[in-house]
Amino acid sequence: MDYSYDEDLDELCPVCGDKVSGYHYGLLTCESCKGFFKRTVQNNKHYTCTESQSCKIDKTQRKRCPFCRFQKCLTVGMRLEAVRADRMRGGRNKFGPMYKRDRALKQQKKAQIRANGFKLETGPPMGVPPPPPPAPDYVLPPSLHGPEPKGLAAGPPAGPLGDFGAPALPMAVPGAHGPLAGYLYPAFPGRAIKSEYPEPYASPPQPGLPYGYPEPFSGGPNVPELILQLLQLEPDEDQVRARILGCLQEPTKSRPDQPAAFGLLCRMADQTFISIVDWARRCMVFKELEVADQMTLLQNCWSELLVFDHIYRQVQHGKEGSILLVTGQEVELTTVATQAGSLLHSLVLRAQELVLQLLALQLDRQEFVCLKFIILFSLDLKFLNNHILVKDAQEKANAALLDYTLCHYPHCGDKFQQLLLCLVEVRALSMQAKEYLYHKHLGNEMPRNNLLIEMLQAKQT
């Protein structure tokens, strides 16, 4: 079923930038992309891209590459399950509550606009992505000039999209064992975990836009209950820093040919991930799942959570010329450029571009905790046992973020979509980081007894 919207708000299709005609298959889109998405799903069409799977999709070029257009549809959040399989007109009416909530908030925003006597300014069309970034060239630690990986093999075709717009990784559901087992329950019976593969991304998010948001309102009744609960679950930064510093000071058996800085950074990431696992264990819904589902979710998103943790630390740091480590140490970008390999430098610069975009979006702590929760549950339901509980968490997280952004940032109606697009870039960054770490692992250059190695060993199965 298609829902109407208020034309006074003059929104643009997130796929191609054309004028939207209503709610179609999960979000506001134009008639052209609505029809294209419906035909593709109902006819089970399979497209190929003759270029690099990063074609520009806008109003004038949307028909040139159906592969990239369909990937863009999925990336921005159009729902496969909303298309009727019987080829009848209309979609499945399962997103009605979200449509109604969105429409009510837009009506409220329009009333505020009219009352205040100013016109809503919208950003440029989201269907016009920037040029694709250069080929991934990055190294993890400073002072490392070893051989750089060449010819990274691409994974299998993209899997179905998760419920938050970010592509869900195609992977088998493992049992209640593996590298995470010892962190989820006391026993540590096994090591084997199933494989997870990277997939191409339809398009990166847009560069930072100077929206000029007002400061968000303080907490209170206007903050969704889910976000308030997540704020209470956030770990204390000082305690995390002290624990990680203590672990880094413990002696370890490092490889004689391994640079000290590289080993420290790997241990730093390892301990940060342990903190993330501890956070996940305390999260509502997640702690109610069986261990197999918990491990499946974490194996899907562990690298994204690590990357997003680093990104938000830089957003808080707020300095373009340096990065802040979890230990509190500040590293100048000029130092990274001169002492790190070209691979690490490239990855750091790409991460900093996302930091600038989130600064322009004025990402706040409430949005950060909600996005982190979204990442945790961003796996397609078919890979999980408890569909009902996870689906409920997905829908509530989406609704909470939508409500919060529209209520606290009424001058930018597309902030919700822009934030979800940023998660696509987070996943792309995490895939590149994993590819590098895996090649370092194959080169026998990773530290021993490292949890990240256990996660990376999924590549070998």
UniProtKB/Swiss-Prot annotation:
What residues bear Phosphoserine in this entry?
A: S203
In the record, the effect of K119R is given as: Loss of sumoylation
Instruction: Spell out the residue ranges making up region: Disordered.
Output: 119-157
Indicate, by first and last residue, each region the UniProt record lists as having compositional bias (Pro residues). Answer: 126-136
UniProt superkingdom: Eukaryota
Q: What is the effect of changing G123A?
A: In SPGF8 and POF7; activity levels similar to wild-type
Q: Which residues bind DNA?
A: 10-85
What mutagenesis or variant effect is reported for P129L? Answer: In SPGF8 and POF7; loss of activity
Q: What is the effect of changing G35E?
A: In SRXY3; with adrenal failure
Identify the stretch(es) annotated as Important for dimerization: 230-461
Mutating D293N has which effect? In POF7; without adrenal failure; partial loss of activity
- PROSITE patterns with a match to the protein in the record: NR_LBD, NUCLEAR_REC_DBD_1, NUCLEAR_REC_DBD_2
Q: Which SUPFAM superfamilies match?
A: Glucocorticoid receptor-like (DNA-binding domain), Nuclear receptor ligand-binding domain
Q: Which molecular function terms from Gene Ontology are attached?
A: chromatin binding; DNA binding; DNA-binding transcription factor activity, RNA polymerase II-specific; enzyme binding; nuclear receptor activity; phospholipid binding; RNA polymerase II cis-regulatory region sequence-specific DNA binding; RNA polymerase II transcription regulatory region sequence-specific DNA binding
Impact upon substituting G212S: In SPGF8; impairs transactivational activity
Question: Could you say which tissues express the protein in this record?
Answer: High expressed in the adrenal cortex, the ovary, the testis, and the spleen.
Where in or outside the cell it occurs: the entry states: Nucleus
* GO cellular component terms, A-Z: chromatin; cytosol; nucleoplasm; nucleus; RNA polymerase II transcription regulator complex
Record: residues binding a 1,2-diacyl-sn-glycero-3-phosphocholine: G341, Y436, K440
Q: Please give the annotated consequence of changing D238N.
A: In SPGF8; impairs transactivational activity
Positions carrying N6-acetyllysine are K34, K38, K72
Q: Which positions hold the covalent cross-link Glycyl lysine isopeptide (Lys-Gly) (interchain with G-Cter in SUMO)? A: K119, K194
Q: Which keywords label this protein?
A: Acetylation, Activator, Disease variant, DNA-binding, Isopeptide bond, Lipid-binding, Metal-binding, Nucleus, Phosphoprotein, Premature ovarian failure, Receptor, Transcription, Transcription regulation, Ubl conjugation, Zinc, Zinc-finger
Q: What does this protein do?
A: Transcriptional activator. Essential for sexual differentiation and formation of the primary steroidogenic tissues. Binds to the Ad4 site found in the promoter region of steroidogenic P450 genes such as CYP11A, CYP11B and CYP21B. Also regulates the AMH/Muellerian inhibiting substance gene as well as the AHCH and STAR genes. 5'-YCAAGGYC-3' and 5'-RRAGGTCA-3' are the consensus sequences for the recognition by NR5A1. The SFPQ-NONO-NR5A1 complex binds to the CYP17 promoter and regulates basal and cAMP-dependent transcriptional activity. Binds phosphatidylcholine.
Q: How does it assemble?
A: Binds DNA as a monomer. Interacts with NR0B2 and PPARGC1A. Part of a complex consisting of SFPQ, NONO and NR5A1. Interacts with NCOA2. Interacts with DGKQ and CDK7. Binds to and activated by HIPK3.
Protein name (record):
Steroidogenic factor 1
Q: Which organism is it from?
A: Homo sapiens (Human)
